[in-house]
A protein has these predicted regions:
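Alpha-helical transmembrane segments of multi-pass inner-membrane proteins
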Residues: 20-21, 42, 71-78, 100, ...
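Loop-to-helix entry and N-terminal half of a specific, functionally important transmembrane alpha helix
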Residues: 13-21, 65, 336, 340, ...
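Transmembrane signal-anchor hairpin modules in multi-pass inner-membrane enzymes, especially those
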Residues: 1-76, 82-86, 110-120, 172-183, ...
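TM-adjacent membrane-interface loops and short helices in multi-pass inner/ER membrane proteins
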Residues: 267-336, 342-345, 349-356
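Transmembrane alpha-helices of multi-pass inner-membrane enzymes
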Residues: 18, 39-45, 212, 226-230, ...
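A membrane-periplasm/extracellular boundary helix in multi-pass inner-membrane enzymes
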Residues: 131, 139-140, 194, 216-262, ...
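Aromatic-anchored transmembrane helix interface
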Residues: 63-70, 84-107, 117, 123-126, ...
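Membrane-embedded alpha-helical segments of multi-pass membrane proteins
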Residues: 31-51, 91-103, 157-166, 206-213, ...
Length: 435
């Protein structure tokens, strides 16, 4: 009886996870009721299994304590927040969703075959989203600021989504030997790569470049690096001039911190965030977009006025009279985060929040690299390498953007959930073999 309940609850959870990922990919900012139903279904399956076996089923992972520590730090900073109610809402509606998703996956998905089906569904979904994005870009149906956005409203979000999943597709391409699977993955990689180019997101371009180099050396597929270099060289001749101009700005290092031409309002945002951090070093201003948006406006306006003051009045001598010319101060955007994940955590949760966050993701990276190096299964090795590369890619984004918000963090914790499910499955297999 217990075996039947375990089997069916695990199967239902698998379908619910696939539906949840699909819905979040195509409707990242809507369909909240359906997303909630998917999550409740998984929680219900987990609960049903515990009731059936009459015991608490909570798998011990290396993330349990870091996650608890991060939540406690976030709660502590929330009670010191500018808007306590909003900060608590961010923790319960956002942070808890990430961690519930993780624990549900680790505790309900039982086999490697289920993992394979979930990963396959994720990659198919990613391919469909990118195909829709390419269609929307060239038809003008879904486009913003001449960039591909697909279902995500902003180019940076779809770029992070692709950067997280594309390395997995590349690594699995080397695992599968049959022509059909390789053909499917080749099409997927092409569509995702084209979509990434059309986002014109420079951080993603650099992140994927570094990631492919990482995969090439880690998998001992150095020819992959030569292929990438060849494709980049070919792109110079076939891509429109606006893409080449965008690429050139990446190399203009001398202008990164002296001009807003390349980084835009990020420079002002980082200066304001550092100023906020200095005034609230230990506990921050509290988690949540609203807290940052309101406080940022005050600090950014003060900094901009201070910087523009010498330029506001240019005095000219004309017929012995002083003529004043005023330069217009550009409006300040109502940003919801500091465009840097480390500043995001420092401003929101202070030093203690950042330390808890670093502990959490150090544990994630350690588990990913260790399991990948020790894995004996070819599929697991390819998948774990792809996940590790995806994590590297998403953290490279963290220097100019933040992934610690929906929907980015949901996709990230989906991947982390798969990582630890693979690790747990491997441990169970070794225990069975030992017996």
């Amino acid at each position: 009886m217990h075996k039947h309940i375990t089997y069916y609850t695990s199967l239902i959870s698998e379908y619910a996870f696939i539906a949840y990922f699909f819905t979040f990919s195509f409707f990242p900012f809507s369909a909240d009721i359906f997303k909630l139903l998917c999550l409740l279904t998984v929680i219900g399956c987990w609960t049903a299994r515990m009731l059936s076996e009459k015991k608490i089923l909570f798998i011990k992972t290396s993330l349990n304590i870091p996650i608890l520590s991060f939540l406690l730090c976030s709660l502590m900073t929330s009670f010191h927040s500018v808007h306590i109610q909003y900060s608590l809402g961010t923790i319960f509606h956002d942070y808890l969703t990430y961690f519930i998703l993780f624990f549900c996956m680790v505790n309900t998905i039982q086999s490697l075959e289920q993992i394979k089906r979930i990963v396959k569904a994720m990659l198919i979904t990613c391919g469909l989203v990118c195909a829709y994005g390419v269609y929307g870009y060239y038809t003008g149906v879904v486009i913003r600021d001449e960039r591909l956005v697909a279902t995500f409203e902003y180019h940076s979000r779809i770029a992070k989504y692709i950067s997280l999943l594309l390395p997995i597709a590349v690594c699995l391409f080397f695992y599968y030997k049959n022509i059909v699977s390789r053909l499917y993955l080749s099409i997927l990689i092409f569509v995702c790569s084209l979509s990434l180019i059309l986002t014109m997101n420079r951080t993603s371009w650099v992140a994927i470049l570094v990631t492919i180099f990482f995969i090439g050396f880690a998998a001992q597929k150095k020819y992959l690096i030569y292929i990438l270099i060849g494709m980049c060289a070919l792109g110079i001749f076939i891509l429109p001039s606006k893409f080449i101009t965008q690429v050139k700005t990446i190399t203009q290092v001398n202008k990164f911190f002296t001009s807003e031409e390349i980084l835009g309002e990020r420079l002002l945002c980082w200066k304001a965030s550092i100023a906020i951090m200095k005034d609230h070093p230990v506990l921050g201003i509290g988690p949540g977009k609203k807290n940052f948006r309101n406080v940022y406006q005050q600090y950014a306006e003060k900094i901009r006025n201070t910087e523009k003051q010498p330029k506001n009045e240019a005095v000219e001598q004309s017929q012995g009279k002083k003529v004043k010319r005023k330069t217009k101060i550009k409006g300040i955007e109502r940003l919801s985060h500091p465009h840097n994940v480390f500043l995001h955590l420092l401003v929101g949760s202070g030093i203690i929040g950042l330390l808890a966050f670093l502990w959490l993701f150090t544990a994630v990276f350690y588990a990913a690299i260790r399991s990948w190096r020790l894995s004996r299964s070819e599929y697991e090795k390819a998948l774990l390498m792809g996940i590790t590369a995806g994590l590297v890619s998403i953290f490279l984004h963290s220097f100019t953007d933040s992934f610690w918000k929906k929907p980015d963090a949901v996709f990230l914790w989906f991947i982390i959930g798969i990582l630890f499910t693979v690790i747990h499955n491997t441990i169970n297999c070794k225990q069975v073999d030992y017996r």
